[in-house]
Amino acid sequence: MQPIIELNNIQFNYQPEDASPALKDVSFSIQQGEWVAIIGHNGSGKSTLAKTINGLLLPAAGTIKVGGKELNEANVWDIRRMVGMVFQNPDNQFVGSTVEDDVAFGLENQGIPRDEMVERVHDALERVRMLDFAKREPARLSGGQKQRVAIAGVVALRPDIIILDEATSMLDPEGRAEVIATIQKIKEESNLTVISITHDIDEAANANRILVMRQGQLTNEGTPEKIFSAGEALVEMGLDLPFPEKLKVALKERGVVVPTNYLTEEGMVDWLWTSVLNK
């Protein structure tokens, strides 16, 4: 099956004279319906990479294909219609005076007929559980609610791919959980491809696969289990340890023998219960 996204030897410089490219020889592919997290410290190139995928930035070298189309000036608008982006600060994304007006904005720009527009706005708000807030002013919403409305605005456009560019980084834990649960629900319903750009290791744990960026290069990729088993190597890259790994470190310091393989939070709970019952 042909990947929905293919990058081959991508290079990008913000200035031609830059000695160190923002992206250097980056290659990977993503399948339809996959959730891929791209992690790395600040300045690693992960957000630059996201902007090349939907054509906000054009690479200096290499090729990008989205939905089988090569990214170039002739195809860039077709590709942008396939890729929706949710950015870091929800307040910077609102243009409508009410929630429903804001969700309708992108549809108006595409010239969608009014009857279809009303239907799409209703459907999108229902899917992110914000239909009861349709007449509300965006400024009166919580951070998590604002991001759910931003997601609804993207969902209404019916893209094949959603990119979350640090979309949960300004939210409290409750808001972050709201957004992740919303994305999981929509992904399962529509077989959407999700790319999350994040430095939040716990958010990345929701992905099928993780790509690790460092100094503009792709340095590692694999399942969350594979990546998180690196342990202290993540800390050396400027990243945090996921909660289960932190718990394992704390238990080891107290003389408890813990599994060497990576465990999810659910797996850690199961292991703890089994350990207690076997004593």
Curated annotation (Swiss-Prot):
It is an enzyme of class 7 (translocase). One of its GO terms (molecular function) is ATPase-coupled transmembrane transporter activity. It comes from the Bacteria. Its main location: membrane. Gene3D superfamilies: P-loop containing nucleotide triphosphate hydrolases (3.40.50.300). Pfam families: ABC_tran. It is found in: Cell membrane. It is a peripheral membrane protein. The keyword Cell membrane applies. Keywords: ATP-binding, Cell membrane, Membrane, Nucleotide-binding, Translocase, Transport. InterPro entries: AAA+_ATPase, ABC_transporter-like_ATP-bd, ABC_transporter-like_CS, ABC_transpr_CbiO/EcfA_su, ECF_ABC_transporter_ATP-bd, EcfA_1, P-loop_NTPase. Residues 5-240 form the ABC transporter domain. PROSITE patterns: ABC_TRANSPORTER_1, ABC_TRANSPORTER_2, CBIO. ATP binds at G40, H41, N42, G43, S44, G45, K46, S47. GO terms for cellular component: ATP-binding cassette (ABC) transporter complex. Its EC number is 7.-.-.-. ATP-binding (A) component of a common energy-coupling factor (ECF) ABC-transporter complex. Unlike classic ABC transporters this ECF transporter provides the energy necessary to transport a number of different substrates. PANTHER family: ENERGY-COUPLING FACTOR TRANSPORTER ATP-BINDING PROTEIN ECFA1, HEAVY METAL TRANSPORTER. Forms a stable energy-coupling factor (ECF) transporter complex composed of 2 membrane-embedded substrate-binding proteins (S component), 2 ATP-binding proteins (A component) and 2 transmembrane proteins (T component). Belongs to the ABC transporter superfamily. Energy-coupling factor EcfA family. This is Energy-coupling factor transporter ATP-binding protein EcfA1. It comes from Enterococcus faecalis (strain ATCC 700802 / V583). The lineage of its organism: Bacteria, Bacillati, Bacillota, Bacilli, Lactobacillales.
